[in-house]
Amino acid sequence: MVNQALKIANISKEQVDAVAFTRGPGLMGSLLVGTSFAKSFALALNVPLIDVNHMQGHIMAHFIDEGQEMPEFPFICLTVSGGHTQIVVVKEHFNMEVIGETIDDAAGEAFDKSAKILGLQYPGGPLIDKYAKQGNPTAFKFTKPRVKDLEFSFSGLKSNILQLIQREQKKDVDFIEKNLIDLCA
């Protein structure tokens, strides 16, 4: 994979100035593998090793492209992914403060788990979005999370969907198929 990445970048190993890796947050197994490889690769090349915060990387990646206008600090950013949902005050490039986040499942995780309940393929978020555009958002009522301040909670929505499906499939085994777009909306 490294050779392929170097080929795409049109550089040789000797032209690598530093090795960057994600130190977290994230899944422990992936972080350990990435960290171990990055340390070994940097050591072999005798170049500096740079650790990067995963969520800071997501936020600042939007400003990497040449010609892209740099942001005016401070700004507020909503980061939503499979594993994280956060509101972040970005004070400077490496000075960020999380002011709100999920207390349970991240939004992306809730989408993927709900999609699985509905029998949709992974990743489920894009499929739910596609079907939701065609559906009736008022066809089904789900409870709203009770959270404080700038917190998020998505586990209740996932549980509501599961309970609704289990209850309605007892009456009609084709319930999901007949109501998919409205369930997604």
Where are these regions (language model features)?
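Short beta-strand scaffold segments in enzyme catalytic cores
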Residues: C77-T79, T85-V89
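Glycine-rich phosphate-binding loop plus the immediately following alpha-helix
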Residues: K91-Q134, K158-Q169
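Conserved phosphate-binding catalytic cores of ATP/NTP-utilizing and phosphoryl-transfer enzymes
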Residues: V52-F75
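A contiguous, well-structured pocket-lining segment that forms one wall/lid of small-molecule binding clefts
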Residues: D129-A185
